[in-house]
Amino acid sequence: HVDKKVADKVLLLKQLRIMRLLTRL
């Protein structure tokens, strides 16, 4: 199964990606 820490890291990376896309608009 996926480790909680890894899942949290992936979530953070996704959020950062979305933030960057939003700031670009």
UniProtKB/Swiss-Prot annotation:
Induction: By bacterial infection. The keyword Secreted applies. It comes from Pseudacanthotermes spiniger. Its main location: secreted. This is Spinigerin. GO terms for cellular component: extracellular region. The keyword Secreted applies. Keywords: Antibiotic, Antimicrobial, Fungicide, Secreted. GO terms for biological process: defense response to bacterium; defense response to fungus; killing of cells of another organism. Transmembrane segments: none annotated. It is found in: Secreted. Active against Gram-positive bacteria B.megaterium and M.luteus, Gram-negative bacteria E.coli SBS363 and D22, K.pneumoniae, S.typhimurium and P.aeruginosa, yeast C.albicans and filamentous fungi F.culmorum, N.crassa, N.hematococca and T.viridae. Inactive against Gram-positive bacteria B.subtilis, S.pyogenes, B.thuringiensis and S.aureus, Gram-negative bacteria E.cloacae and E.carotovora and filamentous fungus B.bassiana.
